[in-house]
């Protein structure tokens, strides 16, 4: 009986990675659920530490921020022109090469638009 009482872990604690600060807290605080109305997703890293590499790849593949405004053609062109002007005014050779690559991409995009318009007319 004394062996069970003095054991440093009970139940699921044995299977999970516990930091020293979490170990200093009592059991209810360690595995407390979020309050009602709050999502469980922010607590996944703490609850399931084994699949962190898969979660980090998923976070990289689906970022929390989105650029919905860039789906509009005018906003996309404006941001692209702003980026190109910033790249061309820089002194770095890498940024100058990026500006040249961006210019080639824009030229290819314009050529594809012309071809698409011609195909549409035919």
Swiss-Prot record:
Q: Name one GO cellular component term.
A: extracellular region
Annotated coiled-coil segments of the chain: 71-87
Localization per record: Secreted
Q: Which domain of life is it from?
A: Bacteria
User: NCBIfam families in the record, alphabetically?
Assistant: type_III_YscX
Q: What is known of its domains?
A: The region between residues 50 and 110, which contains the predicted coiled coil domain, is essential for interaction with YscY.
Q: What does this protein do?
A: Required for Yop secretion.
Q: What else is known?
A: May possess both an mRNA signal and a syc-dependent signal capable of directing its export through the type III secretion system.
What is the name listed in the Swiss-Prot or TrEMBL entry for this protein?
Yop proteins translocation protein X
């Amino acid at each position: 009986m004394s062996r069970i009482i003095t054991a440093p872990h009970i139940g699921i604690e044995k299977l999970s990675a516990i930091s020293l600060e979490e170990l200093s807290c009592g059991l209810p605080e360690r595995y407390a659920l979020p309050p009602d109305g709050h999502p469980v997703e922010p607590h996944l890293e703490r609850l399931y530490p084994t699949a962190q590499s898969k979660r980090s790849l998923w976070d990289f593949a689906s970022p929390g921020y989105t650029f919905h405004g860039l789906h509009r053609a005018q906003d996309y062109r404006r941001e692209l022109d702003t980026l190109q002007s910033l790249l061309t005014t820089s002194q770095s050779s890498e940024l100058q090469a990026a500006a040249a690559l961006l210019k080639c991409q824009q030229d290819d995009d314009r050529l594809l638009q012309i071809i698409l318009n011609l195909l549409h007319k035919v």
